Amino acid sequence: MDIRNIVILTGAGVSAESGLATFRGPDGLWEGHRVEDVCTPEAYRRDPALVHAFYDARREKLGTVQPNAAHEALARLDAEWPGELLLVTQNVDDLHERAGSKRLLHMHGELTKGWCVACGKKFEWTGPMSPNSVFPEPVEGPSFSSAAKEQGSPSTSSGRTEVNVCPGCHAVGRVRPDIVWFGEMPYEMERIDEALRACDLFVSIGTSGAVYPAAGFVQTARYCGAHCIEINLEPSLGSYLFNESRVGKAGELVPAWVDEVLGQSAHSSPISR
């Protein structure tokens, strides 16, 4: 059967090869923190300063790394694949975008966006977000969108400008990272489910197979008849659900797989199941 419709899921293993820490290390911690202390709504209510500091550090780190060969290969597939394609990432970094991917969906949100809990507005945000972070006036640099700079931001008594200000409603200290935390619903689940049920080929890259609902994507795709491939540094918890498994570094295996898929497409040959 010809492959016309592809869904790809990427996880932390893809960005790890660019130098970003995986979601959980061998000790169960994420950059030295328990997940429940920095990645839940309860943690944010309990200690917003800690949560903001954690994501400010992740955002700063993101600015020091570059897309790797896996990101670049997937962007090439996006550009050259003639059929339907949806790249769903669990990662909150922007490395897929920087590599050039367009048909992309961030199911767990984006580190480079803010979300105002006062008005619901979302916007680009690449600098510090902590309410304790302030810059001398006038505001310069990447922390504000152009709209925020034009509208102005409240100043402290010392004449410095608050960083955590919504560019829409101007609420101070109400902007949180646009990240889906544990206990919150991932984005675009209806669209993802529709794509999984319609795809001919599902490929999971660099995921642990431990975090739902993404861990269940292979079951949906395979039940609906898709050929399923896992590309991972080691077999995931759900590797037995895939038709085939390719073990190794994403930066090596993904470019080879993309060459394979595009080569078969160029010759109008079916990708066998």
Where are these regions (language model features)?
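Conserved catalytic core of sirtuin-type NAD+-dependent deacylases
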Residues: 1-273
